[in-house]
Design a protein with these regions (language model features):
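Residue-level preference for non-acidic, small/hydrophobic
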Residues: 37, 115-118, 145
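Active-site/acyl-donor-binding loops of N-acyltransferases
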Residues: 1-3, 129-168
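Nucleic-acid nuclease catalytic cores
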Residues: 94, 102-108, 127-130, 134-138
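Conserved acyl-CoA
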Residues: 116-128
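A conserved beta-strand-loop-helix scaffold within acyl/acetyltransferase catalytic domains
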Residues: 1-107, 147
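Active-site scaffold segments
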Residues: 88, 116, 133
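Conserved acetyl-CoA-binding loop-helix of GNAT-fold acetyltransferases
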Residues: 107-119
Length: 168
């Protein structure tokens, strides 16, 4: 998180989502979260394996973990759940395992907002890193991760800094 400066569009995303309230919860799956998860998967990844997950599969993803894991729920002021992030607590940072959100809010960049929230949270906790999670550089659906500079990737030679989005 050191050296990260949000871009103009990221600052706009923070402003547009300023009504969203985040709360950290134990890694416990709820029907409300699962309902949002299903809507998200059907809208964003209908051909993916996760789209066919039932509640027990979702519960396993959330609760069966060998590390300290928690859920961040993001709600509108009315209390409506609009995004969820499954997050691992590591000794040196936070790791974004998976996030999902209400598809009709896509115009407000909820995925970016959730990442920015985690970066701010890592900074407030004095943690040096926020791990964006698994990344396939050739996947258009994962291309957004390259916007969060400075960025490091783990390769067979260790951690390597990327100098720009173009070096991906």
């Amino acid at each position: 998180v050191e050296g990260f400066t949000p871009s103009k569009s990221m600052r706009r995303t923070l402003r547009r989502n300023s009504n969203i309230i985040a709360s950290q919860k134990q890694a416990f799956a709820t029907e409300e979260q699962y309902s949002l998860f299903k809507v998200y998967e059907q809208a964003r990844h209908p051909d993916g394996e996760m789209a066919s997950m039932d509640f027990n599969d979702y519960r396993s993803m959330v609760e069966d973990t060998p590390v300290e894991t928690f859920i961040i729920e993001f709600r509108e002021g009315s209390g409506r759940l609009v995004a969820v992030a499954l997050t691992d607590q590591l000794s040196d940072g936070l790791s974004g395992v998976y996030k999902f959100y209400t598809p009709e809010r896509a115009v407000l960049s909820p995925g970016t907002f959730v990442i920015l929230w985690h970066i701010e949270r890592a900074i407030s906790l004095g943690l040096p890193f926020f791990y964006l999670g698994y990344w396939i550089a050739q996947s258009p659906k994962m291309a957004y991760k390259a916007r969060f500079m400075p960025l490091e990737i783990l390769t067979e030679t260790g951690w390597n800094k990327l100098r720009s989005e173009r070096s991906v």
